[in-house]
């Protein structure tokens, strides 16, 4: 693939593309990459031929990111794919996330590495994205939980709307998107623009535009945004915590002949260098880095906010084959990461009409680190201005403080130390049922001493005994 040479002097921005299945996320990434020169005409012609062989002629733009046979034959994104895209202002890591409800975990992996979320919604078929079974609202909520503080909303497939109705349809979808975003995300004034990914309209400054669209601007006197390229360049790079101890959650483990295992992920805190003594938790592996790379280019140091690959030297202590996605790399010193079996949490219940009670075991997601998590105790909940101690149930919309026990130890921390390792989503049947953060990670001894939770005891038997005692 012929690409522009990356300018290392430009800051890095990480952008995830999210939205319901068939909204055109991969097509948008493909056409944007082509128009900005990150992929050449010959490569696109190759994708056209491959798409034709799969009887998916209109999907060829998506082949830049949809690389597996399963993705190409089904016409959907399954894994999160990383594409490097240089713009006038940034070197952008584009993370193309799956929209299908069966692959929410993969979407979470992509969103957990991003600074900004690009939400792709179709002008035609918008109702299916926000109706029963639609994943749009869930994606927006998850992106906010995982730290994407800014949104760019692209109303796609505008070319499929009759020309005399495009402005009306765009305004209608924009109003509904504003309503959805205000209810589920921190960014109350997202950039909203119309695009046609397949036709390449409103993607780049030099490309074709919708003449009826007069642009988006944050406030009077600020820049007017017409295209996705301008919307990306309008972003500010979030604060990077290079001065903090190293924390790098692993997103993927690859085995390369002659090299060994490569661990990829984003440096959430601190920096990582070659010849650094590290530990990987909860696997319990200890080793030393041999090389660190960005897009296959060796670096002397990887700063916070970068996605990279890490290779280790020989002589690793521990079972390296047990290292998996969701494990965390840190320096092997007094500030190393620790895996905990449980935590004291503060949570708001959302999207669960019947509420929740002790014993409920949803999936708990800390970015791409996840495990079933049993709500072992509900210590208190807030109803209006009143605090109720030891309630039997927490209703939808109520806040509670409780104790969660993980099925397997997870690397977590307090908000004030590493907030990206403290924020989580509770999920059930691919839907978000709770949003919260860690007040205090708890060791096995703390769970027993402070809360009477014995991890050696069968939780079902304990619950049954407690019920008999109460009776």
UniProtKB/Swiss-Prot annotation:
UniProt keywords (A-Z) are: Actin-binding, Cytoplasm, Elongation factor, GTP-binding, Nucleotide-binding, Protein biosynthesis
Annotated spans, G3: 96-99
Source domain of life is: Eukaryota
Location of the region described as G5 in the Swiss-Prot/TrEMBL record: 196-198
Q: Where is this region: G2?
A: 75-79
Chain residue ranges for the region called G1:
19-26
**Chain intervals for the UniProt region annotation (G4):** 156-159
Q: Which InterPro entries match?
A: G_TR_CS (IPR031157), GTP-eEF1A_C (IPR054696), P-loop_NTPase (IPR027417), T_Tr_GTP-bd_dom (IPR000795), TRAFAC_GTPase_members (IPR050100), Transl_B-barrel_sf (IPR009000), Transl_elong_EF1A/Init_IF2_C (IPR009001)
Q: Which residues form the tr-type G domain?
A: 10-239
Where, subcellularly, is it found? Cytoplasm
Q: Which GO terms describe its cellular component?
A: cytoplasm
- Tell me which residues bind GTP: 19-26, 96-100, 156-159
Cross-referenced PANTHER family: TRANSLATION FACTOR
Q: How does it assemble?
A: Component of the eukaryotic elongation factor 1 complex (eEF1).
Q: What does this protein do?
A: GTP-binding component of the eukaryotic elongation factor 1 complex (eEF1). In its active GTP-bound form, binds to and delivers aminoacyl-tRNA to the A-site of ribosomes during protein biosynthesis. In the presence of a correct codon-anticodon match between the aminoacyl-tRNA and the A-site codon of the ribosome-bound mRNA, the ribosome acts as a GTPase activator and the GTP is hydrolyzed. The inactive GDP-bound form leaves the ribosome and must be recycled by its guanine nucleotide exchange factor (GEF) (eEF1B subcomplex) before binding another molecule of aminoacyl-tRNA.
Q: What is this protein called?
A: Elongation factor 1-alpha
């Amino acid at each position: 693939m012929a690409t522009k040479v990356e300018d290392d002097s430009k800051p890095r921005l990480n952008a995830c593309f999210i939205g319901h299945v068939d909204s055109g996320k991969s097509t948008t990434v493909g056409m944007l990459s082509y128009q900005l020169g990150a992929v050449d005409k010959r490569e696109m012609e190759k994708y056209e031929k491959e798409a034709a062989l799969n009887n998916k002629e209109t999907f060829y733009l998506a082949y830049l990111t949809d690389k597996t046979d399963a993705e190409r034959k089904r016409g959907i994104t399954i894994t999160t794919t990383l594409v490097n895209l240089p713009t006038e202002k940034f070197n952008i890591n584009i993370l193309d996330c799956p929209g299908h409800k069966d692959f929410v975990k993969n979407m979470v992996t992509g969103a957990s590495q991003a600074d900004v979320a690009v939400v792709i919604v179709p002008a035609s078929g918008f109702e299916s994205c926000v109706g029963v079974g639609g994943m749009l609202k869930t994606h927006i909520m998850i992106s906010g939980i995982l730290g994407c503080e800014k949104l760019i909303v692209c109303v796609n497939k505008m070319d499929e709307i009759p020309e005399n109705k495009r402005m009306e349809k765009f305004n209608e979808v924009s109003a509904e998107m504003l309503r959805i975003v205000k209810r589920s995300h921190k960014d109350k004034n997202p950039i909203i623009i119309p695009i046609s990914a397949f036709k390449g309209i409103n993607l780049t400054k030099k490309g074709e535009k919708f003449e009826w669209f007069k642009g988006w601007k944050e406030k009077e006197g600020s820049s007017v945004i017409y295209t996705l390229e301008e919307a990306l360049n309008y972003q500010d790079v979030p604060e990077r915590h290079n001065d903090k101890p190293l924390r790098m959650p692993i997103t993927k483990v690859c085995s390369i002949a002659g090299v060994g295992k490569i661990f990829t992920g984003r440096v959430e805190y601190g920096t990582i260098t070659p010849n650094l003594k590290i530990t990987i938790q909860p696997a319990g592996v200890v080793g030393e880095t041999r090389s660190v790379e960005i897009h296959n280019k060796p670096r002397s140091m990887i700063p916070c906010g970068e996605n990279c690959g890490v290779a280790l030297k020989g002589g690793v202590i521990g079972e390296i084959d047990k290292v998996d996605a969701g494990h965390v790399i840190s320096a092997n010193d007094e500030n190393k990461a620790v895996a905990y079996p449980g935590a004291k949490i503060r949570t708001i219940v959302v999207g669960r009409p019947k509420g929740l009670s002790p014993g409920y075991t949803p999936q708990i997601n800390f970015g791409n680190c996840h495990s079933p998590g049993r709500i072992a105790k509900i210590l208190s909940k807030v109803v209006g201005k009143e605090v109720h101690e030891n309630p039997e149930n927490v209703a939808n919309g109520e806040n509670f403080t409780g104790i969660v026990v993980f099925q397997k130890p997870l690397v977590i921390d307090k908000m004030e130390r590493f907030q990206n390792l403290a924020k989580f989503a509770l999920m059930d049947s691919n839907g978000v049922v709770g949003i919260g953060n860690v007040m205090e990670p708890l060791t096995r001894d703390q769970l027993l001493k402070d809360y009477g939770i014995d991890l050696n005891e069968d939780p079902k038997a304990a619950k049954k005994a407690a019920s008999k005692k109460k009776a």
